[in-house]
Amino acid sequence: MSFPRGSQDRSVGNSSPWWPLTTEGSNGSQEAARLGEGDSPLGDVRNEELAKLEIAVLAVIFVVAVLGNSSVLLALHRTPRKTSRMHLFIRHLSLADLAVAFFQVLPQLCWDITYRFRGPDWLCRVVKHLQVFAMFASAYMLVVMTADRYIAVCHPLKTLQQPARRSRLMIATSWVLSFILSTPQYFIFSVIEIEVNNGTKTQDCWATFIQPWGTRAYVTWMTSGVFVAPVVVLGTCYGFICYHIWRNIRGKTASSRHSKGDKGSGEAVGPFHKGLLVTPCVSSVKSISRAKIRTVKMTFVIVSAYILCWAPFFIVQMWSVWDENFIWTDSENPSITITALLASLNSCCNPWIYMFFSGHLLQDCVQSFPCCHSMAQKFAKDDSDSMSRRQTSYSNNRSPTNSTGMWKDSPKSSKSIRFIPVST
């Protein structure tokens, strides 16, 4: 993609019109470059083979994203279990992914079929606004979800202070902020008249930038707001989360070793309460930490998928505007075009990540369809067998109520402390 210098204010086309960041590309790069230089365009043509591939890829992404995220929303709606804060964030992240499917992928699919934008000026501006709005919403919903995990792990006492209200406020803020930050699209894109086919004129939805710095400023700002800033916040939150978990595990390991050493020497060391030595029971703490760590792992995988899917797209965007020798055409760089299209795979991956880490969501989703009742019964049987094994293990590990001395608590024990008789 080359941006000719010299004009103060120039209209340029949208790269494979769906992509809201790039200003020239697969559908308009040759025309825009030549129009900016004052030359005649080669004609209103495009690489039809690449266009067919784009249409096929976008169609698959759209169907998979809609089915996957709709299934998650249906499972969350029909689940008989009590919904948690994490379920609330998953619901809104699924809504953001559906926004990507309907506001990004679907317009691009229609645009690739028609080649030129078919619609009035207001529709051009609305489509461009919604495309960037979906990108902001998906990124910022990940940020607030990770921030919630940071608060739950590093500041657990704050989760007792109206957690539902705080979660809803965080989610509402991300939606509103995404809408506001995407409004400049209304003033950048519009339907303008362009010249093709040796004098023939047509209309398309293009962007207008002040040269030479307008394009670079726009792409750099969008990359920073949609990708760089969220990744920095996500990385910082996960740095604190990992440090807190590591410190917690190290403390438990040291406490366990200290306890074993005291048993071997026959010495009792610890705080006293009414003639009894009080020691923390690690089992119940482990069960709570295990649940938190599972949600942290799920959020980490979602964030990793977001970075892996979107990083190539933003790298190409920055490369295209800062390297004057970079040229993007349909026939010469089909791999770059497809790599950009695959960025929306992130919206397809998220539903399966939810179901993998929350097995009951898959079960509730299957139960929503009458044709899958046999599979749902299999899930229910597996859950019943698993619960039976846990109850058997619990009863075998418990000591009779009239026993004295020490015993090994079951991992599912609700006791948080144990009392060891100490001679006084």
UniProtKB/Swiss-Prot annotation:
PROSITE patterns: G_PROTEIN_RECEP_F1_1, G_PROTEIN_RECEP_F1_2. The chain crosses the membrane at residues 53-76, 89-110, 126-147, 169-190, 221-241, 300-319, 338-357. The keyword Phosphoprotein applies. Localized within gonadotropes of the anterior pituitary of the brain. Broadly distributed throughout the cerebral cortex. GO terms for cellular component: cytoplasmic vesicle membrane; endocytic vesicle; endosome; membrane; plasma membrane. A lipid is attached at residues 371-372 (S-palmitoyl cysteine). Residues 77-88, 148-168, 242-299, 358-424 are cytoplasmic. Residues 1-40, 383-416 are annotated as: Disordered. Keywords: Cell membrane, Cytoplasmic vesicle, Disulfide bond, G-protein coupled receptor, Glycoprotein, Lipoprotein, Membrane, Palmitate, Phosphoprotein, Receptor, Transducer, Transmembrane, Transmembrane helix. Residues 9-30, 389-405 have a biased composition (Polar residues). Glycans are attached at residue 27. InterPro entries: GPCR_Rhodpsn (IPR000276), GPCR_Rhodpsn_7TM (IPR017452), V1R_C (IPR015076), Vasoprsn_rcpt (IPR001817), Vprs_V1A_rcpt (IPR001224). It is found in: Cell membrane; Cytoplasmic vesicle membrane. Residues 1-52, 111-125, 191-220, 320-337 are extracellular. GO terms for molecular function: peptide hormone binding; V1A vasopressin receptor binding; vasopressin receptor activity. Its main location: membrane. Gene3D superfamilies: Rhodopsin 7-helix transmembrane proteins. Disulfide bonds join 124-205. The modification Phosphoserine is found at residue 410. It is a multi-pass membrane protein. Overexpression of AVPR1A in the brain increases the duration of social memory. Belongs to the G-protein coupled receptor 1 family. Vasopressin/oxytocin receptor subfamily. Receptor for arginine vasopressin. The activity of this receptor is mediated by G proteins which activate a phosphatidyl-inositol-calcium second messenger system. Involved in social memory formation. This is Vasopressin V1a receptor. The lineage of its organism: Eukaryota, Metazoa, Chordata, Craniata, Vertebrata.
